[in-house]
Amino acid sequence: MDPQSAVYSLPRVPTAAPPNAGVPWSHVGEVAVLSFVALICIYLLYLWVLRDLILVLKARRGRSTEELIFGSEAVDRRSPIPNTLEPTAPVHPGPFVPGSG
């Protein structure tokens, strides 16, 4: 066998595939998992800490926590609602007698 024919009789070995220019999928998966965990942590932080902190800060500004309404329907304490249901005659309750009823 001469050297010229030996080249053609050797098995062909495929060359390595060219490297991808994109990001490997394992890196994309890591970023997705870390983003999901961070989102859950922020949500739990809001549930356990930030929501109560917002209520405390609003209560310190002069409102009780029962009056807190978020948005445009907030209570205006400068003009209180007048009491229109004043009694026409004085009410004098009778003495309390136990067992009478």
Swiss-Prot record:
Compositional bias ranges of the Pro residues kind: 90-101
Compartments reported by the entry: Host membrane
Domain of life from the UniProt record: Viruses
GO biological process: transport of virus in host, cell to cell
Chain intervals for the UniProt region annotation (Disordered): 78-101
UniProt keywords, alphabetically: Host membrane, Membrane, Transmembrane, Transmembrane helix, Transport, Viral movement protein
Residue ranges of the TM segments: 30-50
Keyword Ubl conjugation: no
Main location: host cell
Membrane topology according to the record: Single-pass membrane protein
Subunit-level organization: Interacts with the capsid protein (CP). Part of a MP-CP-viral DNA complex.
Family, similarity comment: Belongs to the mastrevirus movement protein family.
Protein name: Movement protein
Origin species: Maize streak virus genotype E (isolate Pat) (MSV)
